[in-house]
A protein has these predicted regions:
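Soluble "head" domains of membrane/secretory-pathway proteins
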Residues: 2-8, 12, 32, 45-293
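Hydrophobic membrane-insertion alpha-helices, especially the h-region
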Residues: 13-32
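N-terminal signal-anchor transmembrane helix
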Residues: 36-46
Length: 293
């Protein structure tokens, strides 16, 4: 009988250990660290290379929790809440996020199957611009993004690029002629901040406003309407960010598709676990446990 009780006690302890371990693993996976991500493209080189495997912490800016999968399947919008993290995103942080568009460029529709890795070069409340190839933010003297790539861009002209690479968001030659060398200034909305609306700047913020309200913006007789309501100003509900790849000559980023809603963010890339050259399959020993800066 004593032996039976001893075996039963051991089995219960083992089951409790397994349950606790699985629980901790779920908590770790959901709230702290994303699964290892393999990098397929060169858009963030030299900081992150194609073939790198990276670790991403969700503690910056905080884990994202989905509210109701049934709801977003019905109305097309992903409903999320952001838990408090250890700190907010800072300029030059390298972040992983869900791509904010899914097939249709006229509306934001978070693609849960597509992950992007880019560097944050402008925060909510910043005003971002590119002046002769150099990234700038109002009242910020720090270098933003990959400085030596931007210096290379200063020496090049429109003739060196195809129109697809040269022309930028919002892709409207009538009101804006922004390009990869001269862009902005573009105000990056912060939650609670308001802007005035007219036909011209509606082009910059149309997708953001429609994403937040789930209603359509339109223009009638030179006036801006949200559904049937005249709109002179708009107060943003979410924070937004300007994301850019370090390899500025080969990166699909905010220069082309606009600002990133905060609810698309997954977390901050912290280090490379290991790396293989995709062309040769050889292990890159120099990139083993390499901090991402």
């Amino acid at each position: 009988m004593k032996r039976y009780k001893s075996i039963l006690k051991s089995v219960i302890k083992f089951i409790m250990f397994i349950v606790l371990s699985l629980g901790l693993a779920v908590v770790f996976r959901v709230f702290i660290v994303a699964p290892i991500i393999s990098i397929p493209s060169k858009s963030m080189e030299p900081a992150v290379m194609a073939g790198d495997r990276i670790i991403v912490t969700k503690l910056i800016p905080g884990a994202r929790v989905f509210e109701d999968f049934r709801q977003f399947r019905i109305d097309g919008k992903v409903q999320t809440k952001r838990l408090r993290g250890i700190r907010q995103v800072r300029r030059n942080n390298v972040l992983v996020f869900n791509f904010p568009y899914s097939g249709d460029w006229d509306r934001i529709d978070m693609d849960l199957n597509v992950l992007y890795l880019k560097r944050c070069v402008a925060l909510p409340g910043d005003t971002f611009s590119i002046e002769n190839g150099i990234y700038k933010v109002n009242n910020c003297l720090d270098s933003l993004g990959c400085a030596f790539r931007q210096q290379e861009l200063t020496l090049q002209s429109r003739d060196d690029f195809s129109p697809v690479i040269w022309n930028c968001f919002p892709h409207d030659s009538v009101h804006y002629s922004w390009n990869i060398k001269d862009f902005g200034p573009l105000y990056v909305p912060a939650s609670g901040n308001s802007i005035s609306l007219d036909i011209r700047n509606m082009l910059l913020y149309k997708n953001l406003i429609e994403y937040e309200t789930n209603q359509k913006l339109s223009v009638h007789n030179g006036l801006v309407y949200l559904a049937d309501e005249r709109l002179n100003t708009y107060t943003f509900k979410l924070n937004y960010y300007f994301m850019a790849g370090d390899n500025i000559f080969d990166s699909g980023d905010s220069r082309y598709w606009g600002l990133l809603p905060e609810d698309c963010m997954i977390g901050k890339a912290i280090f490379v676990t290991h790396s293989k050259d995709p062309a040769t399959g050889k292990f890159r020993w120099k990139r083993l446990i390499k901090i991402i800066k």
